[in-house]
């Protein structure tokens, strides 16, 4: 695998998610991309029970699956204070969580997934995801992988140009938020700024990006004014600048 980036796509007023994904699919095919099956990434969150009574944050276990790795279950344990522990296990981990009902309870109302078509274009793999939570449409999430590189710092500009050329939106020159420099504690107990964009990319990095985006979608507020939560609803999304090219796509 190579470096993978997630990019939310703005859904214009009056257009359904299905319509926009259809238009993006046609654009990819016109560029010479080939359809290469379907994909699915899902996330279910379990909350510790009982919840602390002293106001302290409770623990959460996020369980994710990625169709690119069908034999694996990805788990991210959050202690509620910002510290996370990531685990990769086989699918028996799902059965384990079902047997821990006295300790963790599933928040089924927030179960969320991104699914859709998968395309291959040269060294790129592009996935057009329709994000739904409890069968309610939440937005469009684009996944793009550059297979020929495993360190973002070496290929970000190429990925960025591909995103802008295909999507027609302005993509920030800065590295995505997931790759922002982080403060870590060294073995000597000293704080040090760590440049994550120089790390070798791993499958868990893709999963963590999905959790980041899914968390954002869970927080989204549906715009008022006759826009329900069905497939054609308009959702509050990230601030993304649209070029004239993509504006024309929206009007089609």
Curated annotation (Swiss-Prot):
One of its GO terms (cellular component) is nucleus. Keywords: Activator, Nucleus, Transcription, Transcription regulation. It is found in: Nucleus. GO terms for biological process: positive regulation of DNA-templated transcription; regulation of transcription by RNA polymerase II. The keyword Nucleus applies. The keyword Transcription regulation applies. One of its GO terms (molecular function) is transcription coregulator activity. Signal peptide: none annotated. InterPro entries: Mediator_Med20. Transmembrane segments: none annotated. Component of the Mediator complex, which includes at least CDK8, MED4, MED6, MED11, MED14, MED17, MED18, MED20, MED21, MED22, MED27, MED28, MED30 and MED31. Belongs to the Mediator complex subunit 20 family. Component of the Mediator complex, a coactivator involved in the regulated transcription of nearly all RNA polymerase II-dependent genes. Mediator functions as a bridge to convey information from gene-specific regulatory proteins to the basal RNA polymerase II transcription machinery. Mediator is recruited to promoters by direct interactions with regulatory proteins and serves as a scaffold for the assembly of a functional preinitiation complex with RNA polymerase II and the general transcription factors. Required for activated transcription of the MtnA gene. This is Mediator of RNA polymerase II transcription subunit 20. It comes from Drosophila melanogaster (Fruit fly).
